[in-house]
Structures are given as C-alpha cells and as structure tokens.
Amino acid sequence: MKARLNYGWRLLATGMSFVVFGVCGLLFSVLVFPLAWLWPHRASRQRMVTTIIHWFFRALVAFLQWVGVMELDVAGAAALRDSGPVVVVANHPTYLDVVVLLALTPSACCVVKNAHWGNPCFWGIVRAAEYVSNADPVELVEASARQIAAGYTMIIFPEGTRSPAPNRLHAFSRGFAHIALKAATPILPVLIDCDPPAFTKQMRWYDVPSRAFRIRVSVLEPVAADQLIAHEGSPEGSPDGSHESPSPALAARTLTSAIEAHINQRLFDYGFFETGN
C-alpha cells in the first residue's frame, strides 16, 4: 500500500510539474515576451530573460527533488558556471536534460527545434532569449557564433532528438563542430544518465517509474577543437613536410567523429552505459 501511495503521489506531482511548466511558459510568452521587447537595450534584455529562465529551471529542478519525483547528482558543475563561453555537447536520454543544463548554466543559449517557434508555450521564450533555431544550418552556425561572442555558452544535443535506447546514441550531427571552429571556442562534453529511464522518446509523461528517477550529470574536461583536429589528423602532413590545415568540412567531420567517440567511450567508462547490453 505504501508503495502504491508513493507511486500515486509521484504521478500527481509529475502532472503538476508539467502543468506549471506549460502555464508558466504560456504566461511568459503572452506577458513577459511583449514587455521584454519594450526594453530599449537588446543585450541587457537578453541577459535579463536568460537569467529569469535559469532561475525558473533551478526552482523547477528543486521542486521535483523536494516532492520526491527525481534525484540529481552532478559532478563538475563548476565548469558550467565558470568556464566562460563554450560549446556544451551532451547526450540526450530524457526530456529534462535541457531543463537540468539550463538550471546549472547561468549564461546559456540553446539550439532548439524550429517547431518551438510555433509552440504556444515556447514561442515567446525562444524569441526573447534569442535561442537559435535549427531550421537553417548556415544561420545556426552564424547565430551560435554570435551568441558565444556575446558571452553565452551554447548548449547543444548533437543527436538532434532524445536517445533511441538507454545504451545507444543517435549519430551526431556536425553543427556543434562548425560552431566551435567558427567561434574558436572549446567544447565541453557532458554525460547525462537517467535511472530508471524517465521521459524518454518512447515514454509518455504519465509513464512514471516505480521509484524516483536519478539524473546523473558528469562534466568532462574541455576539449580544444583545433588541438583535437591536429591530433586526429595525419602526422605526416604534406609531401614537403608542412602540415596544411584541413578544409572546414573535413575539420568539422573529424571533430564530430572524435567527440562522438569520446562521449560514447566515457559513457561506458563512467558506468552510464552497461557493457554487453
């Protein structure tokens, strides 16, 4: 009986959280977004909006922990606060990944699906925060580089959608690599795990696990894109002994492959993925 009551409470609390999230998003889009555009200074307006989002998600994560829906274990959170503008590259096991990362990163911008620009709960948020749409690959890189130059960390899930299975990732797209190369900024790999699985691609919001789910976040050491490309490239260089820089396309492809392999390997090393499954 106690277990059933606990399950029912967590189901109710989860539903309440989604309602609060949706209502607050709608109110933000309808009220705060129009008012924000009255603010004359664009840079300070964006800073104000992203700060509000950061603290709202911090409160939401704290609420989910307080009501017993989730637990959160973070290693290396200081890097998200203190590294300066970087490209955060993370795997994407659950719907809450972006909520957690925005709660941990004070000055952050996201690459988000173009569909959110028409979503009544999100259209105002993504515009006021000047998040970057994935609709146009070229503009995605240009806009992300501008955000980094303005002092924001870019949060990117290169799988493009939530992971297909607990022990498997989608292939990484190259957008994050082009951004890191254009902005000449480090990549900060982040590992995310959710146990038991919750809010995956295959689950509905009401598919509450049998116990509180635990999200683990491990922030790895930053990776210098140019150094990684040089390391991954051919050591021989050109016939005359010089080392020619690879084309942007080849550099992005090399960087994407290396970071994807790095994150996959670390997911096994840290026990987020289980060998043999």
Question: Where are the regions a protein language model picked out?
Answer:
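Generic alpha-helical secondary structure signal
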Residues: 29, 59, 120-124, 210, ...
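Catalytic core of membrane glycerolipid acyltransferases/transacylases, capturing the structured
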Residues: 34-55, 66-67, 82-136
